[in-house]
């Protein structure tokens, strides 16, 4: 399933923090479920394994990642106060980069 695929890709760790507490991790869709096709909803390239607070920010477009994997946050978000790294860079596949480009351009509130 989707979560199991993400656990394999991200080695059962939060892509952002490295947290390995399974109960704290969420299988997060990059292109939101509500606008994704059936294929995109199940495509593991359209997902990140994130701790719950990072998932909440990502889902609401308050954080995102550029195509090169660099973390970006809305200007009013204090990542350190949330226990999140303020300078992170993820390594992901080119297929994931395409989904991330969509998220950065269409979901992230600070894209323009």
Map each language-model feature to its residues:
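Internal active-site segments that recognize and position negatively charged phosphoryl groups
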Residues: 1-18
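A detector for short metal-coordination/catalytic motifs
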Residues: 9, 19-22, 30-112
């Amino acid at each position: 399933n989707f979560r199991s695929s993400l656990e394999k890709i991200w080695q059962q760790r939060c892509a952002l923090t490295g947290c390995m507490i399974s109960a704290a991790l969420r299988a997060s869709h990059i292109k939101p479920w509500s606008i994704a096709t059936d294929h995109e909803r199940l495509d593991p390239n359209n997902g990140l394994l994130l701790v719950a607070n990072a998932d909440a920010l990502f889902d609401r477009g308050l954080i995102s990642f550029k195509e090169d994997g660099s973390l970006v946050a809305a200007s009013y978000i204090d990542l350190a106060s949330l226990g999140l790294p303020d300078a992170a860079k993820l390594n992901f596949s080119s297929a994931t980069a395409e989904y991330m480009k969509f998220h950065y351009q269409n979901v992230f509130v600070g894209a323009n």
